[in-house]
Amino acid sequence: EVYPDAQLGDQQQTLEQCTMDALDMTLVANSIIETYVPDFAILGTPYVYDSIEHQQKVFESSKLDDLFATTRDHGFVVLSAYSLGARNLYTRDKAVTTPEELAMKIRVMGSDTCIAMMNAMGGVGVAMAQGDVYSAIQTGTLDGAENNIITYVDLVQYEVAPYYNRTGHLMIPDELCINAKVFDSMSAEDQEALKKCASESIDYMFNLCAELRSDYEAKAAEKGVIFSDADVPAFQALCQDLINDVANRTDMTKAVYEAIVSER
């Protein structure tokens, strides 16, 4: 049985249920797993992937297997990773194309890496529940937020932040997780079949999301969204110290970073 649209709770809650044997499988953002295994921060580091094609190559390789195995101590196993595409800035009052223009309060996901990233880029990172973002931008508590085009349109946040600025700063993965006891209860043949299906689903999901991004950009344009191309190298340069910091935190993050670079 599949329960979409947060019927069983938000992502933090569903992963908790998965670790407590109350839920067999769940799909959650990398930042949620990062709260259990901090080394996962390397997968959500700004500008760590050169392109969506590069990210897909990394996810389809076996080079993340050692990192994925570290979640077992917390009661779940990561089977595969996907991506909705690059996250970009969107703002309420004006376009942002350079770091100098980003002296704004921007909603980010609630991880230390994401907050540090936004601060490094020139803004002020504010962690906030997604359900509060629309009204916070509307009232001026926030100047904007950041997300992929699909989520931006689905949440109709273009109504309060019509400037969509292509910074491409993050490609946060979503990971498919299974309860460790459930996985271990399966026969070896069934385990291999499940892992094979999970691996094959990566290409399907990347292709599907590419089609969705194209459709959603068209929808956004119809709604009057103003697209701007940002000075990506300038933002990337400001994030380099953060990239180096995350990459060199542990032997695992260093190995994963080198594996990501090797797929470029």
Question: What residue spans do the PLM features occupy?
Answer:
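N-terminal secretory/targeting leader peptides
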Residues: E1-H54, K63, T71-R264
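Conserved glycine-rich "GG(E/T)P / GGGxP" loop and the immediately following alpha-helix
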Residues: F68
